[in-house]
Amino acid sequence: MYAVIKTGGKQYKVAEGDFLKVEKLDNIVGDTIEFGEVLMIGGDAVKVGAPLVAGASVTAKVAVQGRDKKILVFKSKRRKNSRKLIGHRQYHTVLKIEKISA
């Protein structure tokens, strides 16, 4: 059984036991989160919401709070010898999907 959930303005396809990396959520490691925005549930029978599946939820546990690898942002202006190099590390949360209920 799998589900499509919406969090952080993005949609993710998840199944029980999966690990999912999403935008940072304000929870500590070990917390349980319930996602009510379930767009679709698949498996033997497919349920597609309009826009959400009524009564469906996905339960996940916070596994890791961390940061991504550094990306480098380089800005320059032509013919001016003006250059700027900036590094950025985005915060993320890793979730373990525990239960999909419809």
UniProtKB/Swiss-Prot annotation:
Keyword Isomerase carried by entry: no
PROSITE patterns in alphabetical order: RIBOSOMAL_L21
Magnesium found in the keyword field: no
Superkingdom field: Bacteria
GO terms classed as biological process: translation
Keywords: Ribonucleoprotein, Ribosomal protein, RNA-binding, rRNA-binding
Molecular function in Gene Ontology: rRNA binding; structural constituent of ribosome
Any GO CC annotation of this UniProt entry: cytoplasm
Family: Belongs to the bacterial ribosomal protein bL21 family.
Function: This protein binds to 23S rRNA in the presence of protein L20.
Description of how the protein assembles with itself and partners: Part of the 50S ribosomal subunit. Contacts protein L20.
Protein name (Swiss-Prot/TrEMBL): Large ribosomal subunit protein bL21
Species whose genome carries this gene: Trichlorobacter lovleyi (strain ATCC BAA-1151 / DSM 17278 / SZ) (Geobacter lovleyi)
Gene responsible for this protein: rplU
